[in-house]
Amino acid sequence: VRYGVAPDHPRIKQIIVALYKILQRGDIRLLGNVEVGRDVTIDDLRDHYDAIIIATGADRDHPLDIPGVDLPESYGAADFVSWYDGNPDYPRTWPLKAREVAVLGVGNVALDVSRVLAKHAEDMLKTEVPANVAEALADNPITDVHVFGRRGPAQVKFTPLELRELGKVPDVDVIVSEEDFDFDEGSEEALRASNQQRQVVKTLTNYAMADPEEHTASRRIHIHLFQAPVEIVADENGHVKALRTERTALNGDGSVSGTGVITTWPVQAVYRAVGYYSSPILGLPFDERAGVVPNVEGRVIEGDTTKDESAPVIPGVYATGWIKRGPVGLIGSTKSDAQQTISHLVEDASEGRLHANTAEVGHEAMVALLESRGVEFTTWEGWELLDAYEQALGEAYGELPGGRGTRERVKVVSRRAMTDISRGAQVDAASADLIGEMGEMGVPTAPERFDDYTGPGRRN
């Protein structure tokens, strides 16, 4: 949620409230800032716990195989999302230099990327956007974002609410061409079967029917359908100067084929939002083709493919979410997925099929192991300190100009600063460079109560 949901989507982030209630019950313990493969191994975890559930999601961009994809201004959406969400493992700066930008893909990630690129910085300030990101967006020269999809309006993967949201962004027009509306029997069948898809088509139609004379905003988001990217074109200096697409046409069943009609679109940057891909976990098998940990209904299996359901099960190791089934579905759709995995875990526990531990079992034993290795781990109590600190940074802004309210928080970006705050250390204005480029705003010192924390992992 912290590094995957756009900062201007507080509605989606409300899932945090439910997670808070669970973590505050006291029967779930958090050990943060611990990397599997660096600080602990899968074998360490299997030795200390009866079962392991892998829920690491998908953090990489799915590859796109077209000429020019490796040009310097060709960016993966996952990297851009990680930057604007303040992921500490990504650079603090982003080269926002292009006036015209292409976004490849017709899912909600493409909408997020397009919206953040087009939105004025002052309209992001009331969110938890990191200070360095807000400052970069303030200097963004962009005027036009072009979103490209291979198929038609009946096949796009936008959800209705996120698509309608584009039309509410201040000083941004959404432009759709009437020429991009075509439906075959497969399309009509898809619309009959899905009320959500009918809502999406209705919203796209409303954008297409808007009076062009009403398009007076300083920034525009253009949605182009039936356009398949075929090449990212470089100038003589090796920088992006254009995107070439091929016009496609419906085949009758909802699929499309190329028509041979090529269009060149002048853009200076390309963002690829064509899907996510999970990263392998050291010590576990990985299906490179599917981008998941091989499993059968959540039980992790040996081998390198999920398709081999006869492969031996690795006792006590399970998977859930995108690392289990691939990057499909939203936060809510993971519930049934998790229930399936947990039902198998409970069944295996009752049948005595879990892994036999070889070390001292439990949380305290793992804490002792981490401390013996010098790992600066953090806890739930430490997260509460960081949460309060970020809210204090937001309060320091006071009222935003133009009646935009107040900042809910300012997200701390640096891993070092997050670790220090979470472990009870004092972080003050002298450490502003660790928190992010705060501009002319002074960074408030940590409240005294942060120094009162004496929980596990406290750094003396």
Predicted regions and their residues:
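FAD-site-proximal beta/loop scaffold in flavoenzymes
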Residues: 72-91, 232-235, 239, 251-325
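C-terminal, flexible cofactor-proximal segment of oxidoreductases
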Residues: 303-460
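Phosphate-coordination loops involved in phosphoryl transfer and adenosine-cofactor binding
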Residues: 33, 97-100, 142, 226
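Core beta-strand elements of the Rossmann-like FAD/NAD(P) dinucleotide-binding domain
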Residues: 44-51, 96-97, 257-268
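Dinucleotide-binding/catalytic capping subdomain of oxidoreductase cores
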Residues: 2-4, 11, 15, 111, ...
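Glycine-/small-residue-rich beta->alpha transition segments that form the dinucleotide
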Residues: 51, 55-62, 107-108, 228, ...
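Feature captures the FAD/FMN-dependent oxidoreductase FAD-binding
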Residues: 16-74, 221-224, 230-244
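Glycine-rich dinucleotide-binding loop and its adjacent helix/turn
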Residues: 61-139, 292-306
